[in-house]
């Protein structure tokens, strides 16, 4: 057993063969793993002093911040880590879209399942501080599920956000990261089943071991992200936080604008630019499903050969518009829903889905041997 464990570490962490020409864009997975581990540690420490009851939830957060030794540090590190996880996740997906990672369907789908778990975990975690923005944000999102009354009752423990809601959200927020951690190991297994891609898109026999060559590249990226993480945790959390969330919940007063965290803004833009809440919810779910469909591009291209090339590095035009429309929706989700933003939001939603569906029928030139996952 001891020998098998050592052999597993040597195979997947030390002697794992990597392409010689990969660059810093391949650091995001390693950085995500480190930040996610920090999130779990800080979350466990915070959970030990948090009270999931509506009369004490807000005050338990204030107790952690003001009275517990270094409690403010753990609280701000946890808040900053959530933003950093999504920032690195978006970059990780962006790199996958650009460098043919979607041709590995099992790796791609397992990664998107982790992304979906991150979304659910972050949302229910945003409710736990029980400030004004947390309460009303939870009310708005749970009202979207009113088309399925039994689901609302099961999730909230009633027809409105109340004490059973925060208890259930706390339990889910504690459990889901460990579920995501299990899928992370599955994701790594599927990745190592074939091997890492590279910027050129050529499967080459010229490879080097992960240690010490590429580990030094990952450590360099970790040093940079650690500096950013600590500076933001210590100095930058308060100016970027919502002031309304520092106020005790008042169920009779609605904030001027209910705005989620920045990493939810693209999906929030889809919700607020569509007049029907059920249609908005369907569009949000469809936007995530579209990413899953990209894994089937490998199969669809055997039927339809439609290639659109942009620049010498062969980025496809649909994928570029797909990414640009996503970041445009991120910007549109922040301001008040005025007519001009609603118009642009709908236009970018159309562009988002049309470019994503267009990319399904393009044929990107690749020289990889995907036989390990070709018949899955």
Swiss-Prot record:
Entry keyword Heme: yes
SUPFAM superfamilies registered for this protein in UniProt: a domain/subunit of cytochrome bc1 complex (Ubiquinol-cytochrome c reductase), Transmembrane di-heme cytochromes
Residues passing through the membrane, by range: 28-48, 72-94, 107-127, 169-189, 214-234, 274-294, 317-337, 340-360
Binding-site residues, a ubiquinone: 192
UniProt keyword annotations, A-Z: Electron transport, Heme, Iron, Membrane, Metal-binding, Mitochondrion, Mitochondrion inner membrane, Respiratory chain, Transmembrane, Transmembrane helix, Transport, Ubiquinone
Chief place where the protein resides: mitochondrion
Keyword Hydrolase belongs to the record: no
UniProt-recorded Gene Ontology molecular function terms: metal ion binding; ubiquinol-cytochrome-c reductase activity
Cofactor note as given: Binds 2 heme b groups non-covalently.
Assigned GO CC terms: mitochondrial inner membrane
Matching PROSITE patterns: CYTB_CTER, CYTB_NTER
Location of the protein in the cell: Mitochondrion inner membrane
Cofactor field: heme b
GO biological process: one example: mitochondrial electron transport, ubiquinol to cytochrome c
Binding, heme b b566: 92, 187
Membrane topology: Multi-pass membrane protein
Matches recorded under CDD domains: Cytochrome_b_N
Residues involved in heme b b562 binding: 78, 173
More details: Heme 1 (or BL or b562) is low-potential and absorbs at about 562 nm, and heme 2 (or BH or b566) is high-potential and absorbs at about 566 nm.
Record-stated family: Belongs to the cytochrome b family.
Reported function: Component of the ubiquinol-cytochrome c reductase complex (complex III or cytochrome b-c1 complex) that is part of the mitochondrial respiratory chain. The b-c1 complex mediates electron transfer from ubiquinol to cytochrome c. Contributes to the generation of a proton gradient across the mitochondrial membrane that is then used for ATP synthesis.
Description of how the protein assembles with itself and partners: The main subunits of complex b-c1 are: cytochrome b, cytochrome c1 and the Rieske protein.
PANTHER family: CYTOCHROME B (PTHR19271:SF16)
Protein name: Cytochrome b
Lineage: Eukaryota, Sar, Alveolata, Apicomplexa, Aconoidasida
Gene: MT-CYB
């Amino acid at each position: 057993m001891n020998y098998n464990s050592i052999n597993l570490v040597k195979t997947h962490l030390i002697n794992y063969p990597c392409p010689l020409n990969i660059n810093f864009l391949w650091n995001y997975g390693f950085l995500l793993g480190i930040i996610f581990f920090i999130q779990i540690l800080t979350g466990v420490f915070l959970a030990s002093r948090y009270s999931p009851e509506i009369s004490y939830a807000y005050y338990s957060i204030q107790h952690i911040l003001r009275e517990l030794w270094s409690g403010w540090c753990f609280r701000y590190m946890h808040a900053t880590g959530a933003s950093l996880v999504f920032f690195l996740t978006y970059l990780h997906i962006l790199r996958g879209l650009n460098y043919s990672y979607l041709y590995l369907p099992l790796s791609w789908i397992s990664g998107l399942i982790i992304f979906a778990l991150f979304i659910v975990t972050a949302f229910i975690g945003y409710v736990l501080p029980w400030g004004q923005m947390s309460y009303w944000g939870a009310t708005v999102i749970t009202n979207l599920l009113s088309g399925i009354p039994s689901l609302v009752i099961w999730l909230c423990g009633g027809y409105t956000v109340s004490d059973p809601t925060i208890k259930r959200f706390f339990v889910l927020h504690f459990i889901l990261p460990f579920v995501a951690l299990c899928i992370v190991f599955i994701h790594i297994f599927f990745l190592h089943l074939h091997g890492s891609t590279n910027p050129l898109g050529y499967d080459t026999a010229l490879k080097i071991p992960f240690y010490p060559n590429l580990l030094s590249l990952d450590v360099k990226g970790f040093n940079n992200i650690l500096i950013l993480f600590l500076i933001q945790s210590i100095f930058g959390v308060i100016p970027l936080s919502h002031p309304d969330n520092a106020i005790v919940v008042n169920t009779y007063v609605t904030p001027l604008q209910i705005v989620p965290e920045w990493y939810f803004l693209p999906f929030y833009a889809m919700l607020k630019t569509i007049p029907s809440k059920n249609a908005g919810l369907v569009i949000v779910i469809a936007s995530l499903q579209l990413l899953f469909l990209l894994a089937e591009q490998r199969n669809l291209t055997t039927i339809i050969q439609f290639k659109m090339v942009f620049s010498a590095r062969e980025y496809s035009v649909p994928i570029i518009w797909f990414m640009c429309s996503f970041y445009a929706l991120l910007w549109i989700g922040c301001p008040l829903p005025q007519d001009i933003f609603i118009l642009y939001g709908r236009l970018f939603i159309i562009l988002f889905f049309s470019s994503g569906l267009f990319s399904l029928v393009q044929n990107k030139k690749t020289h990889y041997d995907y036989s390990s996952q070709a018949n899955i």
